[in-house]
Design a protein with these regions (language model features):
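Membrane-embedded alpha-helical bundles of multi-pass transporters/translocases
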Residues: 1-171
Length: 171
């Protein structure tokens, strides 16, 4: 497999990793400070969303084995993008419900995209060497996504809420 195709495959690793970090690093502070949610409630919502994710992942894996991977990835990016955008724009009315719905959408889309993406990489590699290069491209660009997600909110705006709102538009 050519270097260009390997990097093209790995490119999706950047936005997927870009989406994951803010949920744990920035969202609790954002919802505590700007929506007034108690940290215990925030932790509970994050836990429930992840527990739902634990039940959906086997189903998503089963689907990834039976459906075209690229189509599943494309379909998964819709709830991921919508959920991420909603997460970064807390509302004043019912912020806990808003956060819960946004987390479920984000996690569902993220899990579906990630599971299908990793399965697709296994399918693309003709041998162990090519699969290793695909994983290296995916993980290397994913690391770049983590670095960008960590740095951009503070570089984009003088406060967390505005930085995350801008980050959501970039995503």
């Amino acid at each position: 497999m050519s270097t260009g195709r390997t990097l093209a495959y790995g490119a999706l690793g950047l936005p997927l990793a870009f989406a994951a970090l803010p949920i744990y690093v920035h969202v609790p502070r954002l919802y505590a400070e700007h929506a007034g949610l108690a940290l215990g409630l925030l932790g509970g919502l994050l836990l429930v969303a992840r527990l739902l994710d634990a039940f959906s992942d086997p189903v998503l894996g089963w689907l990834a084995d039976r459906l075209p991977k690229r189509g599943l990835i494309a379909a998964a990016l819709l709830p991921l993008g919508a959920g991420f955008f909603l997460l970064m724009h807390p509302v004043e009315q019912n912020p806990a419900l808003w956060l819960g719905v946004a987390l479920v959408l984000t996690y569902l889309g993220f899990s579906a995209a990630t599971i299908a993406y990793q399965a697709w990489g296994a399918d693309l590699g003709a041998d162990a060497g090519s699969r290793t290069r695909l994983v290296a491209a995916r993980e290397g660009l994913g690391l770049l996504g983590v670095l960008l997600a960590a740095a951009l909110p503070s570089l984009l705006a003088p406060n967390l809420a505005d930085g995350l709102a801008t980050l959501a538009w970039i995503f």
